[in-house]
Amino acid sequence: ARSQPAKIVMASFGAGTSSHFVGELFKNQAGISMLHVPYKGSAPMMQDLVGGQIPFAVDTSLAAAPQEKGGRIKVLAVSSPKRVANLPDTPTFAELGFQGFDLTAWGALVAPRGLPADVRNALVRALATAMATPAMREDLRKVGVDVLDEPPSAYEARVNRELPAMRALVVRAGMSVD
């Protein structure tokens, strides 16, 4: 990758997506150059990876784990701070020597700004109730999702904490969504 940067492809499931950010952070920390090839989604990217059309891709553990279990790909590392349940034998980037490598995609229930407080609170309570069920937590854990019981204020704090680092990575890597 250092000697022939334009020949090594790093595929993501779209420009500006979490997989693009993970790939750029890897390139930055490894000190290598690769050609970013953004796909229009995970499925076509995974199809090309399995088919041998691309040598390297960044995807979610949810998409990658079944392919690895089927012997079609090899997952090299996960970008979370700890190993994930659906790929328990796969090391983290930190375990491989990439310190401070903590970049995970997270999902949140969002609503329009100005949502009445009573409606917002009812949604938060309903989500917390659903996420607290053992069956829901186990189903999510099996596919590599860690459930965080965070109130809206913690979500806002997470966004405010992570956004500056993501903006800095965009600048450092010269990322573009074009």
Segments predicted by a language model, with ranges:
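Hinge/capping helix and adjacent helix->loop/strand transition within the periplasmic-binding protein
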Residues: 1-44, 93, 106-139
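Alpha-to-beta junction loops
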Residues: 4-7, 30-32, 50-59, 72-75, ...
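Short helices/loops that flank or line small-molecule/ion binding pockets
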Residues: 25, 29, 43-53, 62-70, ...
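Short beta-strand and adjacent tight-turn residues that come in two discontinuous sequence segments
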Residues: 39, 58-59, 78, 103, ...
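C-terminal lobe and pocket-closing loops
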Residues: 64-132, 164
